[in-house]
Amino acid sequence: MVNVPKTRRTFCKKCGKHQPHKVTQYKKGKDSLYAQGKRRYDRKQSGYGGQTKPIFRKKAKTTKKIVLRLECVEPNCRSKRMLAIKRCKHFELGGDKKRKVCYAWKVQPCL
């Protein structure tokens, strides 16, 4: 499981220095009905003759790459940028940090 904090101090290109950034997970927007490929597809599909293009069924990957959206918290800046991280099955944003478990019968003290 990947746990990412909700804020991160990192370089802002617009400010030109390290600033705190608000971290959110990128989500794909709604597909446009007026993109050239969609217009062509809809035109081809209309009328008689069933499905005209192959429907993709051989999915290879079980995970997606996680993309973080970093937004500068400076009120005058608010610039946004994307940061891709590795693939993972479980992604968590701002979850609880792992704590070291301390048992009473251990000789060394826990730090």
UniProtKB/Swiss-Prot annotation:
Keywords: Cytoplasm, Ribonucleoprotein, Ribosomal protein, Zinc. One of its GO terms (molecular function) is structural constituent of ribosome. Coiled coil: none annotated. GO terms for cellular component: cytosol; ribonucleoprotein complex; ribosome. Zn(2+) binds at C12, C15, C72, C77. It is found in: Cytoplasm. Pfam families: Ribosomal_L44. GO terms for biological process: translation. Component of the large ribosomal subunit. The ribosome is a large ribonucleoprotein complex responsible for the synthesis of proteins in the cell. Component of the large ribosomal subunit. Belongs to the eukaryotic ribosomal protein eL42 family. This is Large ribosomal subunit protein eL42.
